[in-house]
């Protein structure tokens, strides 16, 4: 029997809410390591919004930090605007990722977050989450793990841009996407790129022409099969080697 409070929350959120206990990506998100009682407490503070359409923003640079956002489905890109007025993409966030950590230090978002496709998110009021984490050691530890993962990702990106050539950058990007899809229960070998080649080039510091040329080269070498936005990894060993990784992706 479903508890009365949970029934009320389902009705208030449109009758179709997926709760933390039932979410297929909870192992990548805040609920991981929490017991049933802690999950219920976390679930009570989460707001589940209607789908975010492609092009819509979760927040803009300069906005006050009010909530963190856990992505349930879809893809969100984060970006800043340079002094010259150009967009600089700083990350692509998939289901299970949390967006907004970089605003905790100052209390204001330093970047924009925009949907690359129709996406679903869970909005988590930060002040309430912060208060709850002070009472729940497991929650606090998981928050620290997630923040640590963000820092590690930033370090990897710095290394990628400073040490690798164009071919290695793109291979590492595809390898990383493959690994992230695998973590979410999707095929690590066949997937669709939700970002444009221009977005990929912007993120990697390469031109659109270079991205297209390299994808063609990867296809000719038998490493990938490319059809529009769809990627099939044909030779995972070669991709891992070019990406500077020792382990296979598929």
From Swiss-Prot:
The lineage of its organism: Bacteria, Pseudomonadati, Pseudomonadota, Gammaproteobacteria, Enterobacterales. InterPro entries: cNMP-bd_dom (IPR000595), cNMP-bd_dom_sf (IPR018490), Env_Response_Regulators (IPR050397), HTH_CRP (IPR012318), RmlC-like_jellyroll (IPR014710), Tscrpt_reg_HTH_Crp-type_CS (IPR018335), WH-like_DNA-bd_sf (IPR036388), WH_DNA-bd_sf (IPR036390). Homodimer. One of its GO terms (molecular function) is DNA-binding transcription factor activity. The keyword Ribonucleoprotein does not apply. Residues 47-50 are annotated as: Activating region 2A. It comes from the Bacteria. This is Fumarate nitrate reduction regulatory protein.
């Amino acid at each position: 029997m479903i508890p009365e409070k949970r029934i009320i929350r389902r009705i208030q959120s449109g009758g179709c809410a997926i709760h933390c206990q039932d979410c297929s990506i909870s192992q990548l998100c805040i609920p991981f390591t929490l017991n049933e009682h802690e999950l219920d407490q976390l679930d009570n503070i989460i707001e589940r919004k209607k789908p975010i359409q492609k092009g819509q923003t979760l927040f803009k640079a300069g906005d006050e930090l009010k909530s963190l956002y856990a992505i349930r489905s879809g893809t969100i890109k984060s970006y800043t605007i340079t002094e010259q007025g150009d967009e600089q993409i700083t990350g692509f966030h998939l289901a299970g990722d949390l967006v907004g950590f970089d605003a905790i230090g100052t209390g204001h978002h330093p970047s924009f977050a925009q949907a690359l496709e129709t996406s679903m998110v869970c909005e988590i009021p930060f002040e309430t989450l912060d208060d709850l984490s002070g009472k729940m050691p497991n929650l606090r530890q998981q928050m620290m793990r997630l923040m640590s993962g963000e820092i590690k990702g930033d370090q990897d990106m710095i290394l990628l841009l400073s040490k690798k050539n164009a071919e290695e950058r793109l291979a590492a990007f595809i390898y990383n996407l493959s690994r992230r899809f695998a973590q979410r229960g999707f095929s690590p070998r066949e997937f669709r790129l939700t970002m444009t080649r221009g977005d990929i080039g912007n993120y990697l510091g390469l031109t659109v022409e270079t991205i297209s040329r390299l994808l063609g080269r990867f296809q000719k070498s038998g490493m990938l099969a490319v059809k529009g936005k769809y990627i099939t990894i044909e030779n995972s060993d070669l991709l891992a080697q070019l990406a500077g990784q020792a382990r296979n992706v598929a």
